Curated annotation (Swiss-Prot):
Keyword match Endoplasmic reticulum: no
GO CC list: cyclin-dependent protein kinase holoenzyme complex; cytoplasm; microtubule organizing center; nucleus
Pfam families in the cross-refs: Cyclin_C (PF02984), Cyclin_N (PF00134)
Name recorded for this polypeptide: Cyclin-J
Gene designation per UniProt: ccnj
Gene3D superfamilies: Cyclin-like
GO terms under biological process: G1/S transition of mitotic cell cycle
GO molecular function: cyclin-dependent protein serine/threonine kinase regulator activity
Family designation: Belongs to the cyclin family. Cyclin J subfamily.
Cyclin N-terminal domain span: 15-143
Keywords from the named record: Cyclin
Length: 384
């Protein structure tokens, strides 16, 4: 969608939205049966970090994760091979959604920390075979809508001057729109972390991201009539997805608070060292797997709740009690379990392969795939 410009502002916006909603109904089914499902979070983070490093558009990032989800759902794949699959999904998605000069080059991918640590080296031939295998799996159809394809259209009317902030007219409409866009982008990234969001339609997830952002910003009504008409989603339909997003937000705020307290405690220890050495404390970032923390300073990717400045005090750690979901059938659970973090090593034990899963590529990464003979010609995009 990057090449099509700001389609949501054009005359064909309604038609494009209807087309996306129609394609949404024909998306492949996702069963969540991958034997490597416990590694899914790590590879979704990997795609997000790499796409952020190369400044790829959100639609490319979301499409890459979606392609990875569908591919993992169908095959039993080794851990080393999953790195190749994830990067191939990102390359395909970037070629389909983004500009050509933003597509990562082969040598850039090989220089990534995750590749060097695993002693993996991508070649043009390996990458070509993997991309062809992915394209054949999806029957050469990459026009698969994701929440990122809908979000801008819904954000176009997400904030209006008739909205109220804490029951009062808004003082700075433009800044509120900026915060709305930042929070919607944050919730979109949250939806990438959990495969359970694949149980909802992409347009529903996008609408829920807008609704959750309005709740965080304390805008009322939480779901105005204009958004109901544009998205064709009633509030009651959005509530389950909204609750899941807000729970994730609460967990992020708690993790950020723990990290802040830990830093304060560390600073106090530097000023007033204790008599006996204190045991070291490890901090695990909410959206950064331990495997990637060593490359974090190189990739420069930060995934945390945005902190607004110089406007209304719109963020709070206890939003569930400060502004509950009005008309919500069930309140947000009071006991929130933090989401697990993936500990990825080369010796991870994998679950048994379900009957539906095809154990076709659980081999070493440099295996040549069986593709049709007429795919012998290298395309121009590999001459980088």
């Amino acid at each position: 969608m990057e090449l099509e410009g700001l389609w949501w502002k054009g005359q064909l916006a309604v038609d494009i939205h209807q087309t996306l909603r129609y394609k949404e109904l024909k998306l492949p089914s996702y069963k969540g049966q991958s034997p490597q499902l416990n590694l899914r979070r790590y590879f979704a983070d990997l795609i997000a970090i790499v796409s952020n490093r190369f400044k790829l558009c959100p639609t490319a990032r979301h499409l890459a994760v979606y392609l990875l989800d569908l591919f993992m759902d169908r095959y039993d794949i080794s851990i080393q091979q999953l790195h190749i699959v994830a990067l191939s999904c990102l390359l395909l998605a970037s070629k389909f959604e983004d500009k050509e000069d933003r597509v990562p080059k082969l040598e850039q991918l090989n220089s990534l920390g995750c590749m060097t640590n695993m002693n993996l080296v991508l070649t043009k031939q390996n990458l070509l075979h993997m991309e062809l295998l992915l394209l054949e799996t999806f029957e050469w159809n990459l026009c698969l809508p994701t929440p990122a394809h809908f979000i801008e259209y819904y954000l176009s009317i997400a904030v209006h001057d008739t909205d109220l902030h804490d029951g009062w007219p808004m003082i700075c409409l433009e800044k509120t729109k900026i915060y709305m866009a930042k929070y919607a982008d944050y919730f979109l990234e949250v939806s990438l972390q959990d495969h359970m969001f694949l149980n909802y339609g992409p347009s529903l997830v996008a609408a829920a991201c807008v609704a959750a952002s309005r709740i965080i910003l304390r805008l009322s009504p939480s779901w105005p009539t204009r958004l109901h008409r544009l998205t064709v989603y009633a509030w009651d339909i959005l509530v389950p997805c909204i609750e899941r997003l807000l729970i994730a937000h609460d967990n992020d705020v708690k993790e950020a608070s723990k990290h802040k307290n830990h830093l304060s405690h560390t600073a106090a220890q530097c000023l007033f060292p204790p008599a006996s050495p204190a045991p070291p404390q490890a901090h695990v970032q909410q959206h950064m797997p331990p495997y990637l923390q060593s490359q974090h300073h190189q990739l420069q990717f930060h995934h945390s709740a945005p902190q607004p400045q110089n406007c209304q005090p719109i963020i709070t750690a206890a939003h569930a009690s400060a502004f509950p979901l009005q008309t919500c059938a069930s309140a947000i659970p009071t006991s929130i379990q933090a989401r697990g973090h993936i500990q990825t090593t080369a010796s991870v034990s994998l679950a048994a392969v379900p009957i539906e899963v095809k154990p076709c590529i659980g081999v070493s990464y440099n295996r040549s795939y069986q593709v049709n003979g007429h795919y012998s010609r290298l395309t121009q995009c590999f001459d980088r």
